[in-house]
Amino acid sequence: MQKHSPGPPALALLSQSLLTTGNGDTLIINCPGFGQHRVDPAAFQAVFDRKAIGPVTNYSVATHVNISFTLSAIWNCYSRIHTFNCHHARPWHNQFVQWNPDECGGIKKSGMATENLWLSDVFIEESVDQTPAGLMASMSIVKATSNTISQCGWSASANWTPSISPSMDRARAWRRMSRSFQIHHRTSFRTRREWVLLGIQKRTIKVTVATNQYEQAIFHVAIRRRCRPSPYVVNFLVPSGILIAIDALSFYLPLESGNCAPFKMTVLLGYSVFLLMMNDLLPATSTSSHASLVAPLALMQTPLPAGVYFALCLSLMVGSLLETIFITHLLHVATTQPLPLPRWLHSLLLHCTGQGRCCPTAPQKGNKGPGLTPTHLPGVKEPEVSAGQMPGPGEAELTGGSEWTRAQREHEAQKQHSVELWVQFSHAMDALLFRLYLLFMASSIITVICLWNT
């Protein structure tokens, strides 16, 4: 059985991989790392660092993974159900593992742990209990083998009665079993919209071992992976991008109206329903253990990081909703019980709004409207009253009343000024998150264009 997987399963180093696509670079293992009894792991460190990407130097070249099974069973004439044992191997070509045996002491094979190399996203259900413990690297050919004979996940029954010609009955039973296997697996093949079953062919041969003759049934299963990115773009990227754009447009709603938070809750609920509906369309390998955590739109090459991209979109929506709730609460507290803005926060706000660097608010002009009076500005002192101009009792009462009115007016002005500062700070936070949204959308579009062209 042969599997074609175009490109890497993940793009952990997206920027590096896009820059080095198609350059034809190869990695040659240094021979000083090869000893008489062992190989220094540092010699393969450059290969281990690239385990997140496909073992190719040009992503337009497909990686061919050949899967072979060895089935064996001990037939029991008194048993109706026979359980088969299997041993499978998956060799593929790794362009990063290369060395010259003549210069490396004649060493042609080296074993290494599976966690250090790229693994093909092909899983044999119920074939082995766990992932093989090691790989065998043999001159750019990597083989993933299971060292133990494990039980296969399917069983076949063949029942015949002893007769004059038991070999004919046995051959007839083989034909019945192969026919049922072929029909059953053709109808129950689960594509998950990722794999296409090309066909199942079988042939029966006779094998002679010593003086005994055995019949062997060989099945050739051909599958192909869907390489077209159009279904993923239409089903996943376009609806998700539309919902993200709608959530970004909600930043234009005024925070004081109180309609921003309910609108974002509705969009978040709609995106959650979209993820639940698309759960059945996601490939079975979208949550692979060796999937990348970067490159959210790498499903143009392979659908592995689709779940990561959706998680990033959902995180942005949740963060936007929490930020809206926090700003609404901040505005409510600022209008009911205004507190003075901290000095460091005031300096940061002046730094942002003074030059128009990161906040869309306009700088204050002049000293119009309520504000601090000139007598409370730094460096300005109140005029002194001379001894000859002391006010009388009636004038003192009028002066005291005017001072109380002025103090009350100054207190209201300071309160209003504090409210304005908190409002400016809230709008600055809202503008910062809006720019983060725009940055994420721009990077997503650029990544889609780059991956589509490559």
Swiss-Prot record:
Q: Which residues lie on this side of the membrane: Extracellular?
A: 25-232, 286-306, 453-454
Q: How does it sit in the membrane?
A: Multi-pass membrane protein
Q: What's a GO biological-process term for it?
A: inorganic cation transmembrane transport
Asked if Cytoplasm is a keyword of the record, the answer is no
Q: Which reaction does it catalyse?
A: Na(+)(in) = Na(+)(out); K(+)(in) = K(+)(out); Ca(2+)(in) = Ca(2+)(out)
For whether the record's keyword set contains Ion transport, the answer is yes
Ranges where the record places region Disordered: 363-410
Q: Which Pfam families match?
A: Neur_chan_LBD, Neur_chan_memb
* Task of the protein: Forms serotonin (5-hydroxytryptamine/5-HT3)-activated cation-selective channel complexes, which when activated cause fast, depolarizing responses in neurons.
State the PANTHER family in the record: NEUROTRANSMITTER GATED ION CHANNEL
Name this polypeptide is given: 5-hydroxytryptamine receptor 3D
Q: What species is given as this protein's source?
A: Homo sapiens (Human)
List the gene name: HTR3D
